[in-house]
């Protein structure tokens, strides 16, 4: 019974407290809402949003201006535009929007639609596309002192002069110029909130990095008007991140340039030197077409990568011309060209030593011919036969001499015809001391004379072919030496061209 009475007392007291507190809270909230309603009526009852918020016409509205960048969306090199997502921080004082917080339930600030109050007509002067002014009219923050704080977001496309000299290792200087479009400095003046762009809320770009972003205050007199107009100009120094272009453009271009060097190491006999040159030239043409789609169409400067591609295309074109010349030299013969002495001395003697080229000696000069050699008189052909075979053949010859017809008018020297298991063999006979009567009695048959003439013809033909082959080999070696000269020359030029590609942006501090 006691517990029930205590519980009843507790719930009774709780109910009484609720009856006392809830109306008080509701009354306070209602009075606060009522205070804001009264404040709105007080402020905007006779408010004119088209008049400047100054007590006197000669007074100047001071607008404090600042810029906060949220994102660097894009830099269009071809159309020379920079697209940014920014917040325009603006602050000014409107004397018609002041109140005493004590009279309005201690309300110190209000959020009011920006369409209801006077706002400065600050626009982007160097706008390239889209709206010059802010399109999304957010609410303004109004304080009891009359201070209005307005931070509308905007996406601007500002014109930017793109310098592609060191593309893709380039650094661009873009600007955004803000100012009042209709009010001159006597009506509205600007002050900078900060000397730099606010990067606290900046979202990093995957292609560009903001190196520096500062603002300056300027006053300028334009040709259209006699008044002076103030502006705040923000200068952005942005640097391209070159990894994408290095992997997809520069490295393939360098590799293709190296293929040009291999053209001079490719043997002329393979018949693919011209094909390789043309393939490299077509590949470079494709890369040049890709670059023309990226960089702006300007005749002021040529981008560094464009210069390198143009240099490589000239490089490849020269390699085609040189390859045609080398192939022409390679296929020369004694019947078409005579080798000048200076070519023989320079390209067969001195230059190969400078290039560390060692030409192997031909087998004839190393070991001599194992099967065939000429007699000192160049009239007889002697084979390398065994002494036993010669003696047997001489005995057979003596037996057959009885059946040989005798003719007159033979030469002074004698000749032996040897028949062995290897076929017909001729050898030079040692001159013997014979009397005139014996010399006049040595006769040969017409068949043997014809055979000897055929052997002489074959020997002369072989000597001529050996001489022609030697000259052809000399021309081929000259072509090889010319190839080696341009191989080293093109390696040096390719190396210097690559250094020339990376050195200027490196010295400029862009790499």
UniProtKB/Swiss-Prot annotation:
Keyword Translocase among UniProt keywords: no
Source organism, top-level taxon: Eukaryota
Keyword Magnesium appears in the UniProt entry: no
Disulfides per UniProt: 160-174, 224-225
Keywords: Cell membrane, Disulfide bond, Glycoprotein, Ion channel, Ion transport, Ligand-gated ion channel, Membrane, Receptor, Signal, Synapse, Transmembrane, Transmembrane helix, Transport
Pfam family, one: Neur_chan_memb
Catalytic activity field: Ca(2+)(in) = Ca(2+)(out); K(+)(in) = K(+)(out); Na(+)(in) = Na(+)(out)
Summary of subunit composition and partner proteins: Neuronal AChR seems to be composed of two different types of subunits: alpha and non-alpha (beta). CHRNA2/Alpha-2 subunit can be combined to CHRNB2/beta-2 or CHRNB4/beta-4 to give rise to functional receptors. The alpha-2:beta-2 nAChR complex is proposed to be a heteropentamer with two subtypes: LS (low agonist sensitivity) with a (alpha-2)3:(beta-2)2 and HS (high agonist sensitivity) with a (alpha-2)2:(beta-2)3 stoichiometry; the subtypes differ in their subunit binding interfaces which are involved in ligand binding.
Protein name, as recorded: Neuronal acetylcholine receptor subunit alpha-2
Organism lineage: Eukaryota, Metazoa, Chordata, Craniata, Vertebrata
Gene: Chrna2
């Amino acid at each position: 019974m006691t517990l029930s009475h205590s519980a009843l007392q507790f719930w009774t007291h709780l109910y009484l407290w609720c009856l006392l507190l809830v109306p008080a809270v509701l009354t306070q909230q209602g009075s606060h809402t009522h205070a804001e309603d009264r404040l709105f009526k007080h402020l905007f009852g006779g408010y004119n949003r088209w008049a400047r918020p100054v007590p006197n016409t000669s007074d100047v509205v001071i607008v404090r201006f600042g810029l906060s960048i949220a994102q660097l969306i894009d830099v269009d090199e071809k159309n020379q535009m920079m697209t940014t997502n920014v917040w325009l921080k603006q602050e000014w004082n409107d004397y018609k929007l002041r109140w005493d917080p004590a009279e309005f339930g201690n309300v110190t600030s209000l959020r009011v639609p920006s369409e209801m109050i006077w706002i400065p007509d600050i626009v982007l002067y160097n706008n390239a596309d889209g709206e010059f002014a802010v399109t999304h009219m957010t609410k303004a923050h109004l304080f009891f002192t009359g201070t209005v704080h307005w931070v509308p977001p905007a996406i601007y496309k500002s014109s930017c002069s793109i310098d592609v000299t060191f593309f893709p290792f380039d650094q661009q200087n873009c600007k955004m110029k803000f100012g009042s479009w209709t009010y001159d400095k006597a009506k509205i003046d600007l002050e900078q909130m900060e000397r730099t762009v606010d990067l606290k809320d900046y979202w990093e770009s995957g292609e560009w990095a903001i190196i520096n972003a500062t603002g300056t205050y300027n006053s300028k007199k334009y040709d259209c008007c006699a008044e002076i107009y103030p502006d705040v100009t923000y200068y952005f120094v942005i640097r391209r991140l070159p990894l994408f272009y290095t992997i997809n453009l520069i490295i393939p271009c360098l590799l293709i340039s190296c293929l040009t060097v291999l053209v001079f190491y490719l043997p002329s006999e393979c018949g693919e030197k011209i094909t390789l040159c043309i393939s490299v030239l077509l590949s470079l043409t494709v890369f040049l077409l890709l670059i023309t789609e990226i960089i702006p169409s300007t005749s002021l400067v040529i981008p560094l990568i464009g210069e390198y591609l143009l240099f490589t295309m000239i490089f490849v074109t020269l390699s085609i011309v040189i390859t045609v010349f080398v192939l022409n030299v390679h296929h020369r013969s004694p019947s078409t060209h005579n080798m000048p002495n200076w070519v023989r001395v320079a390209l067969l003697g001195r230059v190969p030593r400078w290039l560390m080229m060692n030409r192997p000696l031909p087998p004839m000069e190393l070991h001599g011919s194992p099967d065939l050699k000429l007699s000192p008189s160049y009239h007889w052909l002697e084979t390398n036969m065994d002494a036993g075979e010669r003696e047997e053949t001489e005995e057979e010859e003596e037996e057959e001499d009885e059946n040989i017809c005798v003719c007159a008018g033979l030469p002074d020297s004698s000749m032996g015809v040897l028949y062995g298991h290897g076929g017909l063999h001729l050898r030079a006979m040692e001159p013997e001391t014979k009397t005139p009567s014996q010399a006049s009695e040595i006769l040969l048959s017409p068949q043997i004379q014809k055979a000897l003439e055929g052997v002489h013809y074959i020997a002369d033909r072989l000597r001529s072919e050996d001489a022609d082959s030697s000259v052809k080999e000399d021309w081929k070696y000259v072509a090889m030496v010319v190839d080696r000269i341009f191989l080293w020359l093109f390696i040096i030029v390719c190396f210097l061209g690559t250094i020339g590609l990376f050195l200027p942006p490196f010295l400029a501090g862009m790499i």
